[in-house]
A protein has these predicted regions:
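Extended, solvent-exposed regions of the mature portions of secreted/cell-surface glycoproteins
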Residues: 1-120
Length: 120
């Protein structure tokens, strides 16, 4: 269990470095659907602590916005978690630390990972 507005560490390893990922806290969707909504929104500025774009080969517009993987498909981020994601309350709906393929493979559900999170 975590407290609202807490900062948690998320570490990943052995991810496919040829596939960009998003990392965020999201409402767990119905099977087969993309995780959404997600806290932190779409991180277009490349700064912040609510969501992250991880890609070692982003398109030209993503250079400087996406963070590259560390060797071995690794990453480590600190994410600020909020009990509320838009109108959804994570005490009432299932939420998770979520990894998914980025917008270049937005329909590919094979990269989706969910680590359930509960709030105090």
């Amino acid at each position: 269990m975590v407290a609202n507005n807490a900062v948690i560490s998320v570490t990943g390893k052995r991810f496919d470095e040829s596939v960009g990922l998003y990392l965020a806290i999201c409402v767990v969707p119905k099977k087969g659907l993309a995780p959404t909504p997600c806290g932190g929104g779409v991180n277009k500025s490349g700064v912040g602590e609510g969501s992250f774009w991880i890609s070692s080969n982003p398109p030209p517009y993503g250079v400087g916005l996406a963070d590259p993987f560390k060797p071995g498909g690794r990453f480590n981020y600190k994410i600020r978690v909020s009990q509320k994601i838009g109108k959804f309350d994570c005490k009432k709906v299932k939420c998770a630390v979520t990894v998914r393929a980025d917008h270049l493979r937005s329909e590919d559900r094979s990269y989706d990972l969910y680590l359930p999170i509960t709030f105090k």
